């Protein structure tokens, strides 16, 4: 079994926040791949289903961001999962809006949700870092991540979530390259080929004159008629 965790804060007040893009990612997977209804478990909401041959549990911790590790740890203990079975979707200030990167293990870079997960299960789990951009000054970070995505963000956000859903099966089986390619195809679809110019029709040639079969004497006589 794989555990896909989407980080965010519970409640309608936070639903459209940049900080909740992790929630949005697992919700898109659940909706597009026929997962079961969301149920209250492990201090969060869970939905079960399959991605290809892999059984997958989607988890949205409802502990609020700073205590996300409590929920993740509880689910892992129940299913006897290791950090290698876990992938966390989270917002990333250090990536431009719409950019996505995979990461296995490593630090939490000050992200409070990841910090909590580190404290409960260690750092060896996988992450899908979802770029939301940086407001430019550290004092502006909290209000920025707790604000809704702007109208101008909606198109790339929709494409990003579709791409994540498209590539979810590849991600579940460990094919990170194919997952990232699925996202890239949504974010930067191939340009349509330019129509080739129509081939010019060959110019009509004037019909050849019939050969003159008159004798030299006839030609001379015709000149003086």
UniProtKB/Swiss-Prot annotation:
Main subcellular location: cytoplasm
Name by which UniProt lists this protein: Peptidyl-tRNA hydrolase
EC number of the protein: 3.1.1.29
Alphabetical UniProt keywords: Cytoplasm, Hydrolase, RNA-binding, tRNA-binding
InterPro entries to which the protein is assigned, alphabetical: Pept_tRNA_hydro (IPR001328), Pept_tRNA_hydro_CS (IPR018171), Pept_tRNA_hydro_sf (IPR036416)
GO cellular component entries: cytoplasm
Originating organism: Cereibacter sphaeroides (strain ATCC 17023 / DSM 158 / JCM 6121 / CCUG 31486 / LMG 2827 / NBRC 12203 / NCIMB 8253 / ATH 2.4.1.)
Binding sites annotated in the UniProt record for tRNA: 14, 64, 66, 112
PANTHER family cross-referenced by the UniProt entry: PEPTIDYL-TRNA HYDROLASE
UniProt keyword Membrane present: no
Compositional bias of kind Low complexity: 198-209
Catalytic activity from the UniProt record: an N-acyl-L-alpha-aminoacyl-tRNA + H2O = an N-acyl-L-amino acid + a tRNA + H(+)
Function according to Swiss-Prot or TrEMBL: Hydrolyzes ribosome-free peptidyl-tRNAs (with 1 or more amino acids incorporated), which drop off the ribosome during protein synthesis, or as a result of ribosome stalling.
Gene that this sequence comes from: pth
Span list, region Disordered: 184-225
Superkingdom of the organism of origin: Bacteria
């Amino acid at each position: 079994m794989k555990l896909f965790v989407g980080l965010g804060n519970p409640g309608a007040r936070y639903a459209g926040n940049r900080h909740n893009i992790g929630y949005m990612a697992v919700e898109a997977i659940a909706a597009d791949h026929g997962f079961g209804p969301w149920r209250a478990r492990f201090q969060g909401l869970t939905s079960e289903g399959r991605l290809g041959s892999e059984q997958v549990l989607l988890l949205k911790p409802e502990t609020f961001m700073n205590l996300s590790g409590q929920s993740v740890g509880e689910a892992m203990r129940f299913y006897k999962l290791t950090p290698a079975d876990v992938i966390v979707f989270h917002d990333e200030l250090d990536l431009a809006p719409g950019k996505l990167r995979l990461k296995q293990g490593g630090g939490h870079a000050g992200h409070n949700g990841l910090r909590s997960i580190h404290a409960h299960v260690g750092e060896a789990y996988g992450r899908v870092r979802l770029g939301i951009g940086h407001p430019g000054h550290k004092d502006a970070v909290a209000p920025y991540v707790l604000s809704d995505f702007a109208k101008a963000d909606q198109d790339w956000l929709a494409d990003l979530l579709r791409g994540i859903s498209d590539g979810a099966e590849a991600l579940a089986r460990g094919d990170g390259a194919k997952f990232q390619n699925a996202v890239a195809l949504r974010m930067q679809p191939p340009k349509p080929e330019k129509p080739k110019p129509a081939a010019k029709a060959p110019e009509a040639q004037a019909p050849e004159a019939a050969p003159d079969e008159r004798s030299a004497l006839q030609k001379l006589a015709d000149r003086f008629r």
